[in-house]
Structures are given as C-alpha cells and as structure tokens.
Amino acid sequence: MSVPRFQKINFGAYDNYVPVSELSKKSWNQQHFALVFPKPPRPGKRRRSKPSLLQENTSPKYDAEKLRGDRKQPLWMHRSLMRISERPSVYLAARSRHPQKETPPSQEDAKQAAKPSSPKVKKSKEDKDKSDSEAESIVSKEKPRKLSKAKEEKPDEKKDLKKERKDSKKGKESATESEDEKAGAEKGAKKDRKGSKKGKETPSDSGSEKGDAKKDSKKSKKDSKGKESATESEGEKGDAKKDDKKGKKGSKKGKESATESEGEKGDAKKDDKKGKKGSKKGKESATESEGEKGDAKKDDKKGKKGSKKGKESATESEGEKGDAKKDDKKGKKGSKKGKESATESEGEKGDAKKDDKKGKKGSKKGKESDSKAEGDKGDAKKDDKKDKKGSKKGKESATESEGEKKDSKKDKAGKKDPTKAGEKGDESKDKKDAKKKDSKKEKKDEKKPGEAESEPKDSAKKDAKKDAKKDAKKDAKKDAKKDAKKGK
C-alpha cells in the first residue's frame, strides 16, 4: 500500500523529516512572489538592455480568482445581483412619490365651464363679433371698388403701353434706317478703301518719284499733309491705312485713283471679297504706275545714293502716300513688275490682266522701253517670288479723260442707291467665268513653269491672241456700266 502523504517517515539515521506539502507550498510562494514583485533596481547600477528585456514582459499574469481557486458565477446570477444593487432599497423610510397625473375633468365641471361667468362678458363678446363683421363687410365693399378702379386703370395703361410701343417701333425703324444708311456709308467707305488701290507713275517720272516715295512714307506716318486737290475723295484718305492691312495678306495689283469711276471701284470691292488674298486685277490710275515706285525703292535700297527731289505738286493724290507704305511692305515680299506706258491701249491692259491670272509665272507683256530695261534686271530674282505672291501688272496711264473725274463725283453721291445690285450681279458673273478660265490655265502653267519663264515671247503671243477676243467683250460691258452710272 502506498504510504500516506502526511505520515512521518523514518530514514534510519536521519530523524529530520519535512512534510511534502509544506515544501511544495514554500517553493511555489517564493517563485510567485519573485515574479509578481521583482527586485527594485539599485541606484548605483545600470541595467544592460537585453533583447529579451526590450520585449514586453511575457510573464504569466495570475488573476485573483485563480489564486483563490474560486470559479466564476453564472451569468444569470451576476446580472440579477447587479440589477438589485443598482436599484435603491425598497425599504427606505423616505420614499419618493411619482407626481400624480391630473385626472380629466368630469362632465359636470365641463358644463359649468361652458356657462358664462357674467352677462358683461357676453355683451363684450357680441360687440367684438359685430365690429369684426362690419370690418369684413367694409373690406369686401372696398375690394370691388379697387378692382373696378384697377380695371379702369389697366386699359389706360394698356393704351399708353401700346402707344409707347408704337412710338418705340417708329423710333426703332427710324434708327434702323439711319443705321442702315450709316452701315451703307461704312460699307462704301470700306469698299472704297479696299478697292481703291492707287495708280502708278510712268517710268519717265521715276527719277523724281524715288525721292517722293521716301518723303511720302515719312509724311503719311506723322499726318497726311494738305497736298491733295479739291477733287480727292475721302476714300483716298483711308487708303493709306487699308493698304497697310492688305500688304500683309498678299500682294495687291493695280490700284484705282480718286478720279476713277465708281463702277471700277465696285469691281475692286468684289475682287477684294472673292480673292481676299489672291492677286488683284489691274486698275486705272490717275498719275503713276506703282511698279515704278517699287523700282525706285529698289534703286534707293541698292545705292542709297539718290538725292531727295522736289516735293509733289498739290494735285498729287494721297493714295500715292498710301502706295509708298504699301511698297515698303511689298518690297519685302517681292518686287512688282510689268509697267505699261501712257500710250498703251486699254485692250493691251486687259491682256496684261488676263495674262497675270493665266500664268502668274509667265512673262509680262507690252512694257515700255524704259520699264523693260528696269524689269529685265530684276527678272531673275523676281520670277521666284512671282509664283508665290503674284506679279503686279497692267496699270493705266494718265491719259484718262476728265469726264471720268466727273463720273467719280457722281458715283460717290449715289453710293447708297439700291440700283447697284443688278450691276453687281453682272460683275459677279463675269468674275466667276474669268475665274473658271483662269483656274484651267493656271493648271497648265503649273505643269510647265520652266517653259513659261524660258519662253516669255511665245507665251506672250498666245496670250495676245486669246486676250484680243475677250477684251472686246469686257470693254463693251465696262462702257455700258459707266453710261448707266452717268445716267444716274
């Protein structure tokens, strides 16, 4: 049989005995105490930081319940105990009573409340009711009166509004008419500015014009000085500004003078709108060919030796000043060619215009002996620039009749006439036909650009034959237009 635990054991010579339970309890208590209450660090020593110490203390934590050996109470017991403890004791002497709810009043009390407390109160209530009803009746009577007044006022207001609207409409119509007239005037001014490119001087004047071109360019920048004659139109004054804008878009061809007929200005307007950047056709000039001015400027740039000559006479058009500005900008892009003499016929000028559209690369026809000498020098350089920008050609000489000067004045007075619509339609048709023919001819010329430059004489002959037929028709139409405008 096993020896009971607490039984004394004899080891023979060793009479000392220690009960097992006491030894085990001691050792366990010591270990537990050391774990729970570690020794405080001594003041003089520093503890090394070991990795084990750096970690959290992983020693087991013992709950008080485990130490006691007690088990947890069941949940239902715990909850019930907690509830009872929260509630105050039922047997407390001073118990707090809940405030009693007011009982609803009985039927007898309600009847007594319904009865009036005194006859005075009744009378005062009746008086109030009467005053309220009277006030309501007065208000109700006043409302229809106001409505009737408002109705009477409304038709009056409507009539006034209608009158004001009619007046405003009339004012608007008059304003629109005046605006239309203003717009017409502005459009006319714009068209004159765009269309009226000034003529160019003949080569015989080129020597004096070299100095004049420089002087004009400086003068026009500061302010236009009174050199124009009384016959100059206001359109010419705007030409200087517009010519600067047009010089940016593309090279414009022959320009009109102030003395040109309005019909020719209309042609220039349409050409500006349709082409905008394309080459503009040759127009009649009053005194100069602009091409020679370009030559004069080139000579000035090359030599810078020419002396500045006498100022222009009072009859010089201000357009020539604008031409000087244009020449400054155009001289950068390319030189202008093809100058015609004062004795050239209008048929040859029409030929020059058509040749310009057909080839834009081919040789220029019917030049004067002086203009040929100047043109041939720059041909090699200019031919490259012609393809891109288009050569400037065909300018009429100063042999225009004074009758055209009178026509220009009449045309300016009749700018706003609506009868020009028919003439514009005819001109637009002619231009469309001309464009179709030109486009076909340009395609042919583009295929043979070298031949056109190398054989200018052959192309000139062919062009002359084709142009001779077309010139007769165009001249007849222009004369008809001029006659129609003179009749106005």
From Swiss-Prot:
GO terms for molecular function: structural constituent of cytoskeleton. The keyword ATP-binding does not apply. Residues 34-488 are annotated as: Disordered. This is Cylicin-2. Residues 189-407 are annotated as: 8 X approximate tandem repeats. It is found in: Cytoplasm, Cytoskeleton, Perinuclear theca, Calyx; Cytoplasm, Cytoskeleton, Perinuclear theca. Sequence repeats lie at residues 189-212, 213-239, 240-267, 268-295, 296-323, 324-351, 352-379, 380-407. It comes from Bos taurus (Bovine). The keyword Transferase does not apply. Residues 25-487 are annotated as: 49 X 3 AA repeats of K-K-X. GO terms for biological process: cell differentiation; spermatogenesis. Keywords: Cytoplasm, Cytoskeleton, Developmental protein, Differentiation, Repeat, Spermatogenesis. GO terms for cellular component: cytoskeletal calyx. Plays a role in the establishment of normal sperm morphology during spermatogenesis. It is required for acrosome attachment to the nuclear envelope, and proper manchette elongation and disassembly.
